[in-house]
């Protein structure tokens, strides 16, 4: 790429294209990107910044919070609450929605985020990331309530994630394909490195936590068993397994070279539809993957068509290369 295109320029050009995105949405996304830069700085300091280890508290899901979970959550809230683009925010780390204080102007958008995905990897210096989703606030009533957030993923107006690894990379969609940006630390800006990211329809890689195999449902066991049989099995090819235990890192790899990611329902908590959060993880990642030519289902239906019933709803997730996702989904329906 001969000419360096910044995130700001990319978004301005998206705005100019027949008003593809409104100015307020463009400004909101720039603020989210700045917040991700701040989180990246905290992540990079590690032990030198005193940010490693647990915080001695639990989130709404009963998960032990790491210090960086709380720091990242605060960075996103403080960066976004005063800009006038938002009406409210929701976070995986907070019990209920966060209303923009009355002292700040109110916007028309709702921001949802997982401030730091892959928290188990923080202390061992493995890639982690931030996932975010933007919805339009319903305009049929004043104020904001939790029910305003309960929109299916096909109502998203923007979604993205930022992965904090050897490079800090921001991946974004506003409904017109997927673009990747890498943080130039010297300039302090995100620079476009790839547009129209595409996921190959076929793959030889799968990402799943094999230690849970005994707890899976039959269709998932069947799919993985066929992959493990390699060239001698029904698939006629050898597969490799990858598992980072960070959805951001696993999905980023799939966007870069293909693959299928699975976090299925299992028998340990049969009353729960899955482990991952629909609103903070599955919806934004599902839309990004679809915009890159992949597929995303819960094994039975398209993730983006699921009508959420509560803010912290969980869901089974199967996403990535289209033909592989369709195969697993077909096994669930008995095809």
UniProtKB/Swiss-Prot annotation:
CDD domains registered for this protein in UniProt: FBPase
Top-rank taxon: Bacteria
Binding site for Mg(2+) 2: 114, 117, 281
One term under GO cellular component: cytosol
Cofactor or coenzyme needed: Mg(2+)
Keyword annotations of the record: Carbohydrate metabolism, Cytoplasm, Hydrolase, Magnesium, Metal-binding
UniProt enzyme class: hydrolase
Assembly behavior: Homotetramer.
Similarity comment text for this entry: Belongs to the FBPase class 1 family.
Name of protein: Fructose-1,6-bisphosphatase class 1
Gene: fbp
């Amino acid at each position: 790429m001969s000419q360096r295109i910044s995130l700001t320029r990319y978004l301005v050009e998206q705005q100019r294209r027949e008003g593809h995105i409104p100015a307020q949405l463009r400004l909101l996304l720039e603020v989210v990107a700045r917040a991700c830069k701040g989180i990246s700085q905290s992540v990079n300091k590690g032990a030198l910044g005193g940010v490693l280890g647990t915080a001695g508290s639990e989130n709404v899901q009963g998960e032990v919070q790491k210090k960086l979970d709380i720091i990242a959550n605060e960075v996103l809230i403080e960066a976004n609450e005063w800009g006038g683009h938002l009406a409210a925010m929701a976070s995986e780390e907070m019990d209920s929605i966060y209303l923009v204080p009355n002292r700040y102007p109110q916007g028309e958008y709702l921001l949802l985020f997982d401030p730091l995905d892959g928290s188990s990897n923080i202390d061992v210096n493995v890639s982690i990331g931030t996932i975010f989703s933007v919805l339009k606030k319903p305009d049929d009533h004043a104020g904001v309530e939790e029910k305003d957030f309960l929109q299916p993923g096909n109502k998203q107006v923007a979604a993205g994630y930022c992965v904090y690894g050897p490079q800090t990379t921001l991946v974004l969609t506003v409904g017109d394909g997927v673009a990747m940006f890498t943080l130039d630390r010297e300039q302090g800006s995100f620079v476009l490195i790839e547009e129209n990211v595409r996921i190959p329809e076929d793959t030889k890689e799968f990402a799943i936590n094999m230690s849970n195999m005994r707890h899976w449902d039959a269709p998932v066991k069947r799919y993985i068993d066929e992959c493990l049989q390699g060239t001698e099995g029904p698939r006629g090819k050898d597969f490799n397994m990858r598992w980072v235990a960070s959805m951001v890192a696993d999905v980023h790899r799939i966007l870069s070279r293909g693959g299928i990611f699975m976090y299925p329902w299992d028998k340990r908590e049969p009353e729960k539809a899955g482990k991952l959060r629909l609103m903070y993880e599955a919806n934004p990642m599902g839309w990004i993957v679809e915009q890159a030519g992949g597929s995303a289902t819960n094994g039975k239906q398209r993730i983006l068509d699921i009508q959420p019933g509560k803010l912290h709803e969980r869901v089974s997730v199967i996403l990535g290369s289209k033909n592989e996702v369709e195969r697993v989904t077909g096994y669930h329906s008995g095809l």
